[in-house]
């Protein structure tokens, strides 16, 4: 069974076992506008919580996407190279950015559930 967490920087994580799928929230993509380019981390990259892991560029601005937890990148969403707008269309489904192997599950305790995130974005 998977569980979804959210960060104050508007990333989401879907946890399945030891693997976290990471992306930006629907709210974040709405604020950015139409995405035109996504720069993703390489597989094998070790990330620490808070590291700048990816960049999403829209017609408005370029924004860093931060690693919500410590872990190793094990897969990236190759489809975004040809169609970065997938993030706009389905930010919390097919528009995921990367998958990572968790190093410390206790870090999840500092993240928000969906209800807390909805309060954050008002």
UniProtKB/Swiss-Prot annotation:
Cofactor(s) the protein needs: (R)-lipoate
Top-rank lineage group of the source organism: Bacteria
Modified residues (N6-lipoyllysine): 60
InterPro entries on file: 2-oxoA_DH_lipoyl-BS, Biotin_lipoyl, GCV_H, GCV_H/Fam206, GCV_H_sub, Single_hybrid_motif
Gene Ontology cellular-component annotations: cytosol; glycine cleavage complex
Gene Ontology biological-process annotations: glycine decarboxylation via glycine cleavage system
PROSITE patterns: BIOTINYL_LIPOYL (PS50968), LIPOYL (PS00189)
Cofactor binding, per record: Binds 1 lipoyl cofactor covalently.
SUPFAM superfamilies per UniProt: Single hybrid motif
Keywords: Lipoyl
Signal peptide: none
Domain Lipoyl-binding stretches: 19-101
HAMAP family per record: GcvH (MF_00272)
Subunit structure: The glycine cleavage system is composed of four proteins: P, T, L and H.
Protein role: The glycine cleavage system catalyzes the degradation of glycine. The H protein shuttles the methylamine group of glycine from the P protein to the T protein.
Family named by the database record: Belongs to the GcvH family.
PANTHER family: GLYCINE CLEAVAGE SYSTEM H PROTEIN, GLYCINE CLEAVAGE SYSTEM H PROTEIN-RELATED
Name of the molecule in the record: Glycine cleavage system H protein
Source organism of the structure: Bartonella bacilliformis (strain ATCC 35685 / KC583 / Herrer 020/F12,63)
UniProt gene name: gcvH
């Amino acid at each position: 069974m998977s569980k979804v967490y959210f960060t104050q920087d508007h990333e989401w994580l879907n946890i399945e076992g030891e693997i976290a799928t990471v992306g930006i929230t629907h709210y974040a993509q709405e604020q950015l506008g139409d995405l035109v380019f996504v720069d993703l981390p390489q597989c094998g990259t070790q990330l620490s919580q808070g590291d700048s892991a990816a960049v999403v560029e829209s017609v408005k601005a370029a924004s860093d996407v931060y690693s919500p937890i410590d872990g190793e990148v094990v897969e990236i969403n190759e489809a975004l190279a040809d169609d970065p707008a997938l993030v706009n269309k389905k930010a919390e489904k097919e528009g995921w950015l990367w998958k990572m192997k968790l190093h410390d599950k206790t870090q999840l305790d500092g993240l928000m559930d969906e209800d807390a995130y909805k309060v954050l974005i008002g």
